[in-house]
Amino acid sequence: FQTGVGGPSLAANLFLEKYMDERGIKMGWAIGGICGPMVELLKKGKVGKVIDVQDFDLDAVNSIHQTPNHFEMSARQYANPANKGAFVNKLDFVVLAALEVDTSFNVNVLTGSDGVLRGAPGGHPDTAAGSKCCIIVTPLTRGRMATVCEQVVTVTTPGDCVDVVVTDYGIAVNPLRPDLIACLDEAGIPHVSIESLKEKAYSLVGRPDSLEWEDQVVAVL
């Protein structure tokens, strides 16, 4: 299991313990990007081991040299595509954030809707590709901008690696994952199409104008 660095995805850690207790579930191991809530799950025995390549708060920093079964790993062990034993390829679930998601489930975490560089991908594309289930958690809109849109500015993580998009206005499942659709139906969890989420976002904040690009190439992804 892993969560990304975005607020919504990190917040998922805060709500895990209740559901794990109710269902008698224990997590074998977690990787990341580790923060305090995941460390607490480790200390309470809800997680078998934590193996991290970076820490997001002081609780995680202190834990790595104080808590048994909290281990450090290198970036090569974490996500080197030439390493057959990379940890990202062993993930069951990853919960990640997004600046934009489009109707093909492509995700942008690099550039804003204005094309300006806003962040860094980190392990976003690696964990999405390697995990059995990639869940994107994001608000439908940010201010006056639609998060779910027709086409993202920059494809950081391709849509065929993204399985579920969770927003404050509904859940969309990638049609490439009929098994997940069946699971949600069986559990009585409502879901909608990604296109309907886009239209809802546009109805709230309007349809954005297309970006106008100049000829100079500043980066290739």
Language model regions located:
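Conserved phosphate- and dinucleotide-binding cores of soluble alpha/beta proteins
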Residues: 3, 10-20, 24-28, 37-221
